[in-house]
A protein has these predicted regions:
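Condensing-enzyme catalytic core mediating Claisen C-C bond formation in acyl metabolism
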Residues: 1-50, 153-229, 326-351
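Short coil/turn connectors at secondary-structure junctions
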Residues: 2-6, 70-73, 101-104, 129-135, ...
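Conserved beta-ketoacyl condensing-enzyme motif
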Residues: 8, 48-111, 117, 245-263
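Acidic-glycine-rich active-site phosphate/pyrophosphate-binding loop
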Residues: 28-33, 85-99, 137-146, 261-272
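Glycine/charged-rich beta-loop-alpha catalytic/anionic-binding loops adjacent to active sites
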Residues: 35-41, 74-76, 96-109, 146-151, ...
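Claisen-condensing/thiolase-fold acyl-transfer catalytic domains that form or cleave C-C bonds
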Residues: 55, 81-83, 87-88, 101, ...
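Short beta-strand segments
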Residues: 110, 135-141, 169, 309-313
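Flexible, glycine-rich active-site loops centered on histidine and acidic residues
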Residues: 124, 128-163
């Protein structure tokens, strides 16, 4: 089944201030010699929750798209973090805060750091089945507090950061997006489920033992070489399926991952080295928001590629999506300064 392309009508981000993760580790007594991850990571403050960061990102995306919240038919929340446990809904809270109508449906989805790409695919199909219109894909993570910066064994996770990003998308709605989403392809590695996990709070271990931090996230049981091999195989398979499905020749990659080395592995596997938009140097690894923060930067930098790949993954699934430029449309006036700014200011899109 071939769907009409999904217009990327607007993209907005909301990012807390970055911190130096090496300084945090040093202050907690961990050695930083040989650390290979991102140096900076955005860390949220008291008012930075998935719903509050998410609605700020969505409001900026709506302004960028010149669309009102009342026009949204679907809001997908694609983060793993939540203000409260289920069945409390982050997407529905974002709808309430943004002023969406009762005709809008809120859905919370989860696929780790891959969820924004799966969200774009889901929104595409949902809008097609429901006659078109506008939807929002919102990703927000607040997970820096789950990382032990004093544990050298967790150094691969030190750069986990907090933040949010949102895309307003449209199908057959006369949107004026510069890029159009054609679709995505995915490959899974289910044996890697749980490679990064929080041990406590679920039904298997609802309460942590005395003296144990119940929120602590850790890496479990895989060597780096195993993980890199899985990433190479997963991305290669997903990308081959994408290229077989769509004839466009991609010339740019938007991707951010847990470390510069992992981004390099992905870009080389996709043969898009030196043609990659990366944001980890400023933000760290944000999970679901990464791909939209990168897309916002790509749009701000006004590249002229005809086809762009979005790449994202969790440890257990890998995906690539394809965006193509719509050259038939007149460019709109600039909406404001770049959204991924130097340290020292709250980062977002100023309409």
């Amino acid at each position: 089944m071939r769907l009409s392309p999904l217009d990327i009508a607007g993209v907005g981000v909301d990012l807390p201030e970055p911190v130096d993760v090496r300084a945090l580790a040093t202050a907690q007594g961990a050695p930083v010699d040989g650390y290979r991850g991102w140096i900076s990571a955005c860390h949220g403050g008291a008012g930075d929750h998935p719903s509050s960061m998410g609605v700020r990102a969505l409001e900026r995306a709506l302004a960028d798209a010149r669309v009102s919240a009342a026009e949204l038919r679907l809001v997908l929340f694609c983060g793993a973090s939540r203000d409260y446990p289920p069945s409390w809904s982050v997407s529905t809270e974002i709808m309430r805060l943004a002023g969406a109508s009762d005709h809008c449906l809120g859905l919370d989805t989860s696929a780790g750091c891959l969820a924004t790409l799966t969200g774009l695919d889901l929104a595409h199909g949902w809008l097609a089945l429901h006659g078109g219109g506008h939807a929002a894909v919102v990703a927000a993570e607040r997970w820096s507090h789950t990382i032990d910066h004093g544990d050298p064994a967790s150094s691969a996770l030190w750069s986990y950061g907090d933040g949010a990003a949102a895309a307003v998308v449209a199908l057959d709605a006369g949107a004026a997006g510069r890029l159009r989403f054609l679709g995505a392809e995915f490959r899974s590695r289910s044996a890697y489920n749980g490679y990064v996990r929080i041990e406590y709070g679920g039904t298997r271990a609802p309460v942590a033992p005395a003296g144990v931090d119940p929120h602590r996230r850790r890496v479990v049981g895989r060597s780096r070489d195993e993980v890199i091999a899985a990433y190479r195989e997963g991305y290669a398979a997903a990308y081959a399926a994408l290229r077989a499905r769509f004839p466009a020749e991609p010339t740019h990659l938007v991707c951010n991952q847990i470390s510069p080395g992992v981004v390099g592995t992905i870009s080389s596997e996709l043969d898009l080295e030196d043609r990659t938009t990366v944001t980890g140097h400023e933000t760290g690894h944000l999970g679901g928001p990464d791909v939209l923060v990168g897309l916002r930067r790509y749009l701000d930098e006004e590249h002229d590629d005809q086809a762009v790949v979005l790449a994202a993954s969790a440890s257990y699934a890998f995906g690539t999506g394809l965006l193509v430029a719509d050259r038939s449309r007149e460019p709109r006036p600039p909406h404001g300064p770049p959204s991924v700014e130097p340290a020292g200011t709250r980062k977002g899109v100023t309409p």
